Amino acid sequence: MTRREGLAALLGESAKLAQGPVVGHTSTLRVDQLRAGSQQPRRQFGTEGLTELAASIQSQGILQPLLVRAVGDTYEIVAGERRWRAAQLAGLTEVPVIVKSLTDQEAAVIALIENLQRENLNLIDEVEGKLLLVANALGIASEQARSRLNELLRNPVPEDVETLSAVFLPLGRESWQSFAKNKVRILNYPPPLVEALRQGMALTMATLIARAPENKQADLIAKVQQGAGRKEIVAEVERLCHRPTVRLEKRVAQALGNQKWLDRLDPQDAEAMQHWLSQMPRALQQEIGDN
């Protein structure tokens, strides 16, 4: 079996486990015997959503067991961390679980697919989770995943390309190439913008704000959080990006139109000015020539 075939089989089985319900022997574990999964892509759990889930658990119990794996003398949650957290809010001391023997790679695939299919991840958690999956699939350190994707875009290695295609197949319509080109770069955004994306800001809005001067981005983020629409943000970004250029053009025009200033130039500066004017853009030459 090739690496691609083996990975495809793993992804298919992991997708079944993630989509649930999980089939297997159900047992019960104390909540303090469990710990959050190391392969969990979700960094934040909304307080309001957890409170609602806790209320549901209080009235109906936990309808689907958590999927866990043994790690030393504890159990790591692979799928169901929200249920575990909500169960503690609800005052439960035990939760139903199904224990599976899973590798790090299997656990990462299951955790990511479960989160992508059950409840939308914020964009930063999605990107970081997929990078973790890429690292596991290619057998590299997680911090190398971004640079490796960029390398493969420039110089594709057939086996790695096949592996990545198999990785992204069960995750939706997005290809690994699209992910590498369009989403990975957001991790390089300034920290306030990354945090805004983590809090749920749309990528289209964040991409707009990223075009603005960095010292103005916090104000734009605040405007979006206060309800500003795309049209308003586009106009504000355009104003911030083009205002300095317009001001410079006006100042240049004013200086060139100031005959007294031109007359005060010494011969060396006057010669430099003539040289600079001889290299003016063609559009400006045509405008001057027409007048």
Swiss-Prot record:
GO BP field: chromosome segregation
InterPro entries linked to this entry: Chromosome_partition/occlusion (IPR050336), ParB/RepB/Spo0J (IPR004437), ParB/Sulfiredoxin_dom (IPR003115), ParB/Sulfiredoxin_sf (IPR036086)
Domain of life: Bacteria
Organism: Deinococcus radiodurans (strain ATCC 13939 / DSM 20539 / JCM 16871 / CCUG 27074 / LMG 4051 / NBRC 15346 / NCIMB 9279 / VKM B-1422 / R1)
SMART domains according to UniProt: ParB (SM00470)
Keyword hit for Iron-sulfur: no
GO cellular component: chromosome
Protein's UniProt name: Probable plasmid-partitioning protein ParB
A Pfam family the protein falls into: ParBc
CDD domains according to UniProt: SPO0J_N
